[in-house]
Structures are given as structure tokens and as C-alpha cells.
Amino acid sequence: MIFAKKTEAAGFKAGVKDYRLTYYTPDYKVKDTDILAAFRVTPQPGVPPEEAAAAVAAESSTGTWTTVWTDGLTSLDRYKGRCYFIETFEGQKDNQFICYIAYPLDLFEEGSVTNLFTSIVGNVFGFKALRAIRLEDLRIPVAYVKTFEGPPHGIQVERDKLNKYGRALLGCTIKPKLGLSAKNYGRAVYEGLRGGLDFTKDDENVNSQPFMRWRDRFLFVAEAIYKSQSETGEVKGHYLNATAGTSEEVLKRAECAKELGVPIVMHDFLTGGFTTNTSLSKYCRESGLLLHIHRAMHAVVDRQKNHGIHFRVLAKTLRLSGGDHLHSGTVVGKLEGDKDVTLGFVDLMRDDYVELDRSRGIYFTQDWASMGGVIPVASGGIHVWHMPALVDIFGDDACLQFGGGTLGHPWGNAPGAVANRVALEACIKIRNQGQNVLREGGNALREATKWSPELAAACEVWKEIKFEFDTIDTI
């Protein structure tokens, strides 16, 4: 009874009230320091858009399902998330809409993608009042961007380290992805690098299995790198996958790579986790190692149009966490990827300043300030006939990665690498002459086959191979 009197005197009124009374504020003026989020929301039948949107703002910031007396011990008006705009669509049977929410910067720990995601995409995705919810985009304010170190090195520093300019980089994932011994694996790496590739790569699930322990792989791959460099006079690299069961083991493997003198390591950032990724990125920056990032598991999170997190958000947060390369899809290969959507998040990975452009799925203008860019990696079901389209789509600041498109060459790995290098150089040549590479690229490849038997064989093998399916995730 005593406590009840004190509570009443303090003006606390227990009970449940609509979220929209507190968290829906259409008159709110967005601040430059706010983190902005665009959610695609599908509410349960009978739930008004304002209430559903306000529930998202509440549950991802200061709110809970009922009024609590400790609300009076802080300033909710300062710390709460606010839904400031709702965008509806005519003719939507499920009442789906886009809600825009502003979060005060004080809600988030500096330099922590882990904390950012825990708040914004935490409990709210299991909220019963919503049938589905998808985070379409985030606006990261410069004030928050500057609390992150970002990519270990960035695009320009990588080019300077490699001494390679004026064209995309060429890579290859070693296949079969599992089952090779370390020595045979090293041989496959050597053949690809000496044939003209800039990089070869561990597949995402190559860690340290009984058939090939990580240290053995690192040693044989380092030997392959040094041998191919001495023969070609070019800087070569292999993405040594440092992903492991613990963060300590990840850093241990990266340290071994540094001691061997190789230029780059790799991490599976979603399965490995953002905390480990940020720690590895810091180590790579201090050690001079480049960091290649694989997005294994991303489609579990981003492929469904109505629920999950769009890849453009994952790409933004990876840039904050740190990585010099990130797989981005190919548009033309075997993996999901709409062209306009892909170009949108490729710009978000590489550019310093990206304007709002809904035609490419970009909901907010993003200013990265001085943070370095991330090289997009096009990988998955691509071969020499795709080269003109890849050069047209991605330009120079990209890594084009041909796994089966190198190792599947009828004459072996090295000729497969030669074919890809010749195809790339042929497309770059006509582009630099002012020709339309998308329209004239096929003719350039046919012309190059007259003096490159390796390219001729590759063109013959893959002339009928296409991956033509409708894209699920469109604007």
C-alpha cells in the first residue's frame, strides 16, 4: 500500500496503451545525427499501419508491451525511436507499407555493428503483430560512421599494393571445394596464378578439416604464390580462409598468414560474426594484410522480399565492420541478382557519397566521409562469354572470380586462367577505344580466339551455358 501511494504520487499510471500514442510522430524533423531505417512491414489483419509502425519503433528502441514506472527515471523523448513517415502502396492486398524510423545516436555503442543490429533487428522481427518485416535500408550518419575504422586498406591502397591498375582483378575459387589434400590444393593454386590470375581463393567452407588442416594449406599455398610470382613478375595472392570456431583461432590463423608473407586472408563474416570480423579487420590493418569477405549464409537473411534484411544493409554494415573485398553477386551468373539492385549496393560499397535513388533500391542518401571503399566480387557461375557484361556492369574496381570458369577448361587450370585473362584484356581494350563493350564484346572475344587457342577452347566449351531465371528480389 505504501508503494502504491508513492507510485500514484509520482504520476505513474500502469497499464497498456497504443504504441502510436508515443512512437508515431509524423511531425518529427529528422536530425543529421539520427540513424534512419526503412522497414517493409506486413501487419497482421486489423492492425493499423500507424500502430504497426510505432510498434517497430518502440520495440527496437525504448519501448515494451506495457507502461513501466522506470519510464519516469529517464527522458523517453530524447531516447525513443520515432516513426516519422509511412509510405503505402495502392492495391496491396496484405496492407504492406514502408515505415521510416529515426533513432537517436545515443542508443548505439560507438564502433559496434553488433550493437547496431541487436537494437534495430533484434526482438522486433518476431513480433506477433507483424506477419513479416524486412529492413530495406539504413542511413548511417557521418557522426556514427566516424566511430568505425572501416576497411583495413580500401581500394586505392590495394591497387598500390598489387601494382595493378586500369582493369578489374581476376580471381578463381579452387574446386572441388572440399576433398583435396593440401599439396594438391597448392598445385591447383599455382596453376591458376601462373596462368594470369591475380588471386585464387579458398571456398567459404574450407576451414581446417581432416583431409586438409589449415596450417598445411597455408604452407603449400604460400609456396604456390611465391613460385608463380617469380615466374610471372606480378604480385599474386590467395584468399586464405581464416574463419574458425573461435575468435582467438581466427586471429591465430591470420597471424600465421602474416608470418608467411602472403598478401590477403579471408573471413566468412555472417557465419563468423560481426564482432570477430571487426577484430580481424583491425588486425589486418595493423599487419598490412588485405581482407576478403565472403557472404556465406546471406540468402537465408536477404532473399525473401517480405521478411529479413536486404543485402544493401549487410553491405553497408560490412563496410563499417571492415573488409577490402565483399561478394556482391554477378547479375549474369548462377546466383540471384537484379541488375539495378546490384548496381545500387555496389555503389554503396565503393563510393564516398551515394544519393537517394529508389530506382536502384536506395532509400537514403549515404555519406561515407573519408571511409575507404570495398571492392565488389562477382562470383558464381560465370565464364568467358560473360566477360563483356561483367566489364560493363562492374567497371575496373571489382574482382571477377571464375571458379568453374577457370578450372573447368578442357586443358586444365593454367589454360583456363589464360583464357580469362585474354578475355578481360580484349574487353578492356575495346572499351578504352570508346566502343560499347556490351555490344561489341562478343566480337572482341571472337577476334581474340584467332591468336589465343586457350580462349578459343573456353568459348567453345561454354557457348551454350546460360542461367536464365526470374529474379526473386526486385525493386
Curated annotation (Swiss-Prot):
CDD domains documented for this protein: RuBisCO_large_I (cd08212)
Cellular component aspect of the GO annotation: chloroplast
Catalytic activity: 2 (2R)-3-phosphoglycerate + 2 H(+) = D-ribulose 1,5-bisphosphate + CO2 + H2O; D-ribulose 1,5-bisphosphate + O2 = 2-phosphoglycolate + (2R)-3-phosphoglycerate + 2 H(+)
Coarse class of the protein's main subcellular location: plastid
Cofactor binding note of this UniProt entry: Binds 1 Mg(2+) ion per subunit.
Binding-site positions, substrate: N123, T173, K177, R295, H327, S379
Cited InterPro entries: RuBisCO, RuBisCo_large_chain_AS, RuBisCO_lsu_C, RuBisCO_lsu_C_sf, RuBisCO_lsu_fd_N, RuBisCO_lsu_N_sf, RuBisCO_lsuI
Site, as annotated: Transition state stabilizer: K334
Places the protein is found: Plastid, Chloroplast
Claim: Glycosyltransferase is one of the keywords in the record: no
Binding-site residues for Mg(2+), renumbered to this chain: K201, D203, E204
Cited PROSITE patterns: RUBISCO_LARGE (PS00157)
Location of the active site: K175 (proton acceptor), H294 (proton acceptor)
GO biological process: one example: reductive pentose-phosphate cycle
Top-rank taxon: Eukaryota
Single GO MF descriptor: ribulose-bisphosphate carboxylase activity
EC number: 4.1.1.39
Modified residues (N6-carboxylysine): K201
Listed cofactors: Mg(2+)
Record's keyword terms, sorted: Calvin cycle, Carbon dioxide fixation, Chloroplast, Lyase, Magnesium, Metal-binding, Monooxygenase, Oxidoreductase, Photosynthesis, Plastid
Family affiliation: Belongs to the RuBisCO large chain family. Type I subfamily.
Further details from the record: The basic functional RuBisCO is composed of a large chain homodimer in a 'head-to-tail' conformation. In form I RuBisCO this homodimer is arranged in a barrel-like tetramer with the small subunits forming a tetrameric 'cap' on each end of the 'barrel'.
The protein's assembly and partners: Heterohexadecamer of 8 large chains and 8 small chains.
Function: RuBisCO catalyzes two reactions: the carboxylation of D-ribulose 1,5-bisphosphate, the primary event in carbon dioxide fixation, as well as the oxidative fragmentation of the pentose substrate in the photorespiration process. Both reactions occur simultaneously and in competition at the same active site.
UniProt xrefs under HAMAP family: RuBisCO_L_type1
The protein, known as: Ribulose bisphosphate carboxylase large chain
Higher taxonomy: Eukaryota, Sar, Rhizaria, Cercozoa, Chlorarachniophyceae
